[in-house]
Amino acid sequence: MNKKRVLTGDRPTGKLHLGHWIGSIMNRLQLQNDPRYDCFFIIADLHTLTTKTRKEEVLHIDSHIYDVLADWLSVGIDPEKSAIYLQSAIPEIYELNLLFSMLTPLNHIMGIPSIKEMARNASINEESLSHGLIGYPVLQSADILLAKAHLVPVGKDNEAHVELTRDIAKTFNRLYGSVFPEPDILQGELTSLVGTNGQGKMSKSANNAIYLSDDEKTVQEKIRKMYTDPNRVHATTPGRVEGNPLFIYHDLFNPHKEEVEEFKTRYRQGCIKDVEVKARLAEEINLFLNPFREKRSEFVAQPKILEEALQKGTEKMRSVARETMEEVHNNLGLSRKWRSILASSK
């Protein structure tokens, strides 16, 4: 059976949180354990440089790579089933990114909304947009097509990136002959989780995240401060359940559905205190996180396991990358010149 290749991953900007679990990790585990798919998970450290260029930020990337690795392995990403690789360790990505940049009209890139959103989140004004940030979607296309991925799991906010990738693949194949598959978008049921402050999706930069590695007391404290219904000033005031982060989290992480429905009824009637509902949520989230925390501590204590997992996956991706670039060189006609140069230098 020919497996469909899947490519997805994370920028190493720090530890992963419940938003990552809901938005991507659950889906990745399903794909990894499905025999129809061959999964490649990229730690996209080059992409981190598009918005984090200060020396102190760059110096943290190395430790963040191991944070992501430890989190991935602790939740069940298996290096025996999936290739986990480091983007910057694949030399071919730099060349393919350059070649694709020659084929991509600037207006196609500037029409992608996520570029300006990334700039806003990083407090970068439009006049200061770097070439690397503007070209971020082209580098992402190079990641996808270098791996010859058939499927790319993304949320709606990143669909335009995959559409650009399809356009680049079509353009290259039309001009130079067929090399690249045109990847399809693969969407999960949920793509984001509201932050604990009720303001937008959970993220490190917004300081509204519960991390997979947070200890029990930290989880309790974050949930104690969680945003609920601002109009509910007393426990006897009927509260709003819909859109309330407290109940969104209960629906996702409390497996006792009858209890959750009872909480909702009492909350709407003004017959229960926020503190009681929050305490139960903290209990359930801590029960949910306990296995991850235990496994993570084991991996952190044995960093060689993390290093071996990354090396194994990176070597697999290097092999794929070499094969892809050999096809690219052949179709472009560059390989003939390079071979003659190599032959004359011997």
Swiss-Prot record:
Provide the Gene Ontology terms for cellular component: cytosol
Q: Name one GO molecular function term.
A: ATP binding
Which residues are involved in binding L-tryptophan? Answer: D143
Q: Where does ATP bind?
A: R11, P12, T13, G19, H20, G155, K156, D157, L193, K201, M202, S203, K204, S205
Give the record's subunit note.
Homodimer.
**This protein is called what?**
Tryptophan--tRNA ligase
Q: Where is this motif: 'HIGH' region?
A: 12-20
EC numbers for this chain: 6.1.1.2
- Which cell locations does it reside in? Cytoplasm
Q: Could you list the residue ranges forming a coiled coil in this record?
A: none
What InterPro entries does the record tag this protein with?
A: aa-tRNA-synth_Ic, Rossmann-like_a/b/a_fold, Trp-tRNA-ligase, Trp-tRNA-ligase_bac-type, Trp-tRNA_synthetase
Q: Which NCBIfam families match?
A: trpS
Keyword annotations:
Aminoacyl-tRNA synthetase, ATP-binding, Cytoplasm, Ligase, Nucleotide-binding, Protein biosynthesis
Q: Where is this motif: 'KMSKS' region?
A: 201-205
Give the enzyme's main class according to its UniProt record, as a single word: ligase
